[in-house]
């Protein structure tokens, strides 16, 4: 059995995987074959993309270094040799081995990243409330736009995102098309809850006074 993933999806997921994290199982890209998804998270934001996968194939984690090696071997632009990668797995004793095959026949075999990937589905908000204000790390917003553009194989410099905040839950970022999304945890402007509330109020008051013709409500 094999799962085939576009190089664009693999590159997009790598923008959200953890780097040198003690939770080593986050330092890679998770292929959830049960539901056909490619997933990556660093604990603060989460990338999810759709892929086609056999439902009876075991899920596995491709470590960052191996994923980056595969992406590099696929090439880019005029030097592209493969636009997709087929993954298969074999088990020996307590070890899971992954074989990645490119469209030109090149193959890479390496061990799967050990550990259990967290149940990412639990943090997906059940209710999205666009009226609740929240603050987000600015770099994470840029990374969300970049990841979604890469997934679509588009220019990240021209990418925009739709933001669907959910209060204290993760906000959902999409590009208006099905197949991929990024989840980002909101951040506190300060460690003082009262100060954060005042900051929201002050921002709205300033907005109303500076632009009296525009309605602004929390």
What are these regions (language model features)?
Residues 1-218:
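DNA polymerase processivity clamps
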């Amino acid at each position: 059995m094999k799962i085939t993933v576009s190089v664009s999806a693999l590159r997009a997921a790598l923008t959200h995987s953890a780097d040198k994290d003690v939770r080593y199982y986050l330092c890679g890209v998770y292929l959830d074959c049960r539901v056909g998804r490619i997933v990556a998270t660093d604990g603060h934001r989460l990338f999810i993309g759709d892929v086609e996968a056999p439902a009876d194939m075991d899920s596995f984690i491709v470590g960052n270094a191996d994923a980056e090696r595969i992406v590099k071997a696929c090439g880019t632009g005029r030097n592209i040799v493969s636009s997709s990668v087929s993954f298969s797995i074999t088990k020996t004793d307590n070890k899971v081995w992954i074989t990645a095959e490119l469209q030109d026949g090149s193959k890479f075999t390496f061990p799967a990243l050990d550990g259990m990937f967290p149940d990412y589905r639990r943090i997906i908000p059940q209710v999205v409330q666009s009226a609740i204000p929240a603050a987000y790390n600015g770099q994470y917003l840029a990374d969300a736009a970049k990841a979604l553009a890469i997934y679509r194989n588009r220019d990240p410099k021209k990418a925009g995102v739709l933001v669907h905040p959910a209060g204290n839950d993760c906000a959902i970022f999409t590009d208006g098309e099905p197949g991929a999304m990024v989840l980002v945890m909101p951040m506190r402007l300060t460690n003082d809850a009262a100060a954060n509330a005042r900051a929201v109020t002050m921002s709205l008051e300033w907005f109303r006074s500076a632009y009296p013709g525009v309605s602004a409500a929390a």
